[in-house]
């Protein structure tokens, strides 16, 4: 069995982000993508990424101000980092959010 690749969403507290995770995971499952999508508070980012290899980090709009700092920390490790577009987040559009993550992953591999 193929191991699942991990995508992490980081936010302030995690309530609305867990809804987005569920929507993104449903789209991934629907398309047979071997992905595991999880949400954590941004304060735990270093700890979570250190213990679990991730292929992509997305920040929720509430913590988007930390985007550059997060990129500076994790992109040198080969982990692409992006922010979820506030409009996509507001609509809780799991498909568009997942597409954004996949674009980030592809751009990192070039």
Across the structure, where does each feature detected by a protein language model lie?
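Conserved active-site segments centered on acidic
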Residues: 5-44
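Short, surface-exposed alpha-helical segments at coil->helix boundaries
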Residues: 18-22, 64-71
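Short, well-ordered alpha-helices that flank and scaffold nucleotide-derived cofactor binding pockets
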Residues: 22-30, 72, 99, 103
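Short acidic active-site motifs
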Residues: 44-48, 66
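Short acidic/histidine-rich motifs immediately flanking catalytic phosphotransfer sites
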Residues: 51-56
């Amino acid at each position: 069995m193929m191991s699942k690749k991990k995508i992490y969403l980081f936010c302030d507290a995690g309530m609305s982000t867990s809804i987005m995770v569920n929507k993104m995971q449903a789209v991934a499952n629907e398309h047979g993508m071997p992905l595991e999508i999880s949400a954590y508070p941004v304060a735990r980012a270093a700890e979570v990424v250190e213990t679990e290899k991730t292929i992509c980090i997305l920040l929720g709009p509430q913590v988007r101000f930390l985007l550059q700092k997060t990129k500076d920390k994790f992109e040198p490790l080969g982990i692409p980092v992006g922010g979820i577009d506030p409009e996509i987040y507001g609509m809780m559009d799991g498909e568009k959010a997942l597409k954004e993550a996949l674009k980030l992953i592809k751009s990192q591999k070039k």
